[in-house]
Curated annotation (Swiss-Prot):
This is FAD synthase. SUPFAM superfamilies: Nucleotidylyl transferase (SSF52374). Disulfide bonds: none annotated. The gene is ribL. ATP binds at residues 9-10, 14-17, 92, 119. Belongs to the archaeal FAD synthase family. It is an enzyme of class 2 (transferase). Homodimer. PANTHER family: FAD SYNTHASE. InterPro entries: Archaeal_FAD_synthase (IPR050385), Cyt_trans-like (IPR004821), FAD_synth_RibL (IPR024902), Rossmann-like_a/b/a_fold (IPR014729). It comes from Methanoculleus marisnigri (strain ATCC 35101 / DSM 1498 / JR1). The keyword Nucleotidyltransferase applies. Signal peptide: none annotated. Catalyzes the transfer of the AMP portion of ATP to flavin mononucleotide (FMN) to produce flavin adenine dinucleotide (FAD) coenzyme.
Length: 149
């Protein structure tokens, strides 16, 4: 059995997330997803949705066999427990593949690291969705326009 692990924040779940998880699942027989803890999200703005809600939504997705919250102190602990054959990264995740492979090997983990390409649609990231919401549904400008397309 080929075990795959996907990781992410998964804030404001969107088609790009689903694409990432579907493509990750296609690489193996079992997909486990590690959802970032609120306290550990430091490389971008804090999530809008609390970690328990993000975890619940990920668990409900068809491609996902198992989902869990990441460890508060050691991001490699859940990976070591799962012992995946493959770890996938999203197109915009900040990890360097070779550095991650090295860190895994230091812990006795021999998982391949695969970067999944971006979703081909226009709303492939939470930041793009937020930007579009603000541009199309934000407060009206002084001229009376609502910024709608």
């Amino acid at each position: 059995m080929i075990r795959v692990v996907a990781t992410g924040t998964f804030d404001i779940l969107h088609p790009g997330h689903l694409y990432y998880l579907e493509e990750s699942r296609n690489l193996g027989d079992e997909l486990s997803v590690i959802v970032a803890r609120d306290a550990n999200v430091k490389h971008k703005p804090r999530p809008f949705l609390p970690e328990d809600q993000r975890l619940r939504m990920i668990r409900a997705l068809k491609p996902v066999d198992h989902a869990l919250l990441g460890d508060l102190h050691d991001m490699f602990r859940p990976i070591a427990e799962i012992r995946p054959d493959i770890i996938t990264l999203g197109f915009n995740q900040h990890f360097d593949e070779e550095h991650l492979r090295q860190k895994l090997r230091e812990r006795g983990l021999d998982a391949d690291v695969v970067r999944i390409p971006g979703y081909p649609g226009s709303l492939a990231s939470s930041s793009k969705i937020i930007e579009r919401i603000l541009n199309t549904r934000g407060p009206p400008d002084p001229t009376g326009s609502h910024g709608e397309e």
